[in-house]
Amino acid sequence: MKQQRNYKMILVTAIMVFFGSTSMMAQVPPSGKYNTTNYPEDRKAIEALGMLADSSAYLNDDYISVGAEGMVYYGRMEENNSFKKNDIKFKSVTPVQGTAILRIFDGKTAISNAILNVVFSSSKGDLHVKVIRSATYVKQLGKWYIVFGQGTLVKTEAELEGSMKKSLQKN
């Protein structure tokens, strides 16, 4: 039993060293690795989608989202209803400089990724989170739409270590 526990601690330590040493490098896209200048007009159209406050940016019937809390939403309305149910509204979204990347493929499909500092307002107070936001876009009949979005919570090293220890205890 003691030997198994020592093995788990060595494993956790090795994983933490690995993630701790690569976490900052992995957050910023490598310079020059991806084509981030092709289709300049499409880039402008896709970036403008983020400024729309209505559902016209979404291909509503085909939109799927995974929230940072781990819930899957099928359609923009389902996602909006979750915000209303939990009394949460976006207060601010601030991209972390140098983390945004937008890749466009064949002028018809695009994928974006960025780290965002997000503040939600709620009746219980403001909720501050840092997320890695990824989105997929498609172009239909000359217009870009968001069809998939996912927010993944960025954990501190202590939070990551705690969740790893908790996961190891389940085994």
Which role fits each region the language model picked out?
Residues 21, 25-58, 164-171:
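Short, low-complexity N-terminal intrinsically disordered segments enriched in polar/charged residues
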Residues 130-158:
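Short beta-strand edge/turn micro-motifs at domain boundaries
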Residues 95-98, 113-115, 128-134:
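Short, surface-exposed coil-to-beta transition loops
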Residues 108-118:
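A short hydrophobic beta-strand element
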Residues 37-40, 44-45, 56-108, 127, ...:
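A solvent-exposed, acidic/Ser-Thr-rich amphipathic alpha-helical stretch
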Residues 2-12:
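Bacterial N-terminal signal peptides that target proteins for export
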